[in-house]
């Protein structure tokens, strides 16, 4: 996956997480679990970006 695609994926995950966070703030407890899930996905994608950037930098 390209760096741009990974960044778009993070953006999409953040938008979904924000929507779920609004539901959680309104009292929907199960939305909190979904927020945590999306944040974990974002963390993983961010790590992939870091790895890809480091790999590209080392091969320059």
Residue ranges and their predicted role:
Residues 4, 53-59:
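Membrane-interface helix-loop junctions in multi-pass transporters/channels
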Residues 1-20:
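N-terminal acidic leader/helix
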Residues 25-33, 60:
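Short, surface-exposed loop/turn segments at secondary-structure junctions
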Residues 14, 18-21, 39, 43-46, ...:
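A structural signal for well-ordered alpha-helices, especially hydrophobic packing surfaces
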Residues 32-40:
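Short, charged, amphipathic alpha-helical segments
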